[in-house]
């Protein structure tokens, strides 16, 4: 479905909702008289208590535009999280790359609102991301303490949080053994 947005200041026409289609996923798609289609949360549409035959006010159009943007951002974030854990910083970057052309709403504010909601419902967690990322690096590659710490910080995990996660995986003896294992592996690879 293609969603088109108009700058509201350019729109001098009266806009009506021509049709409303409810989906099983809790969204509603509105077909407007200016040929736009907006998909947003059904509760937002219900909250406007807008009869279909009445023209939309400018403020109602702004709300619908903003909520349609929010729904697109939310769906994209959920699709990223369905594949693997992401840090909040990764999600911000990916969403801003995909939605940079939308001029009708403040994408950054909507991303922050969505991330806050995702964190409240435990769909996104930087701590969980850090644990899974560290576990992956320890099991798949010969990474040491400082390399993992640096990589976590590149993903937006604070040094303190990254250090706490690394401490969960082992003490100084664990990391020293890991470093020795890396050196042995490196020596084997250079001798062949």
Predicted regions span which residues?
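An alpha-helical, amphipathic repeat domain used for nucleic-acid recognition
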Residues: 1-192
